[in-house]
Amino acid sequence: LYTDLRNRRLIWNKETSTLLTPISYHYFEDSAPNPRPLRPVHRVKGRSICLWNGGAAENYFHWMHDVIAPIALASDQGVAINFDDYLLPWSSSQFQTETLQQLGIELRDCLSYLKFNWIDAEEVSFISSTRFGALGCHFSKPAIESLRALWIPESNQSGERLIYITRRDAKTRKVENEEEILSFLEPLGFEAMELASMSVAEQASLFQSCKVVVAPHGAALANLAFASPHCHIIELFPPNWVTSLYANLARTVGCYYLSLI
């Protein structure tokens, strides 16, 4: 994203989520190891807002917590989210469309900057991240509350369901001995759930209804934002990857958390 901002020349690097200023669009052309003509700049008139703070655009977790949660918090704090264009890493997926509509953002006003290398905006605003700390593993409680309020009006309602979130529908990190896990859990009353085909509203309702959630590490646990306080979370990790991301999200909501490797 490039904008003159009245000749002050500001660059937003979408790969590293950093602001670089004052440098010009041609900085990248001149400094490249093998200089080559840059793709044309896409001009955007009026007031725009860039709604992105890092992560993978197509990933459910990053979309919910790096795009939607900051907008929801800003709106709840009285900031008018009313712009001519919304610059997003938008790929028209079902959950992206549903969440934008829930926020009252018209899809016709959304501009996916994934389609352009360079955007020149007359006036552009940025929204701050609501995650902080090392690797963004800590969450703003007000932001989580604003996110919950979009789909869970009564946030303290408790649930009784026991669920296991399967990754059978995932492209990566499948659980090799999942049938063995299910043979242990199902007699205890656990239901195996695939979330990919569910709407955000359905996923939020599901997590609110749970007493215990067992799940391999993955984006589906972004829905812990909708879990009832005192829900028990058991996260399963592979031996080569452990993170405190969902442990901190669970604690922010008020859930009990345990991990197994």
What is the role of each PLM region?
Residues L1-I261:
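The feature primarily captures lumenal catalytic ectodomains
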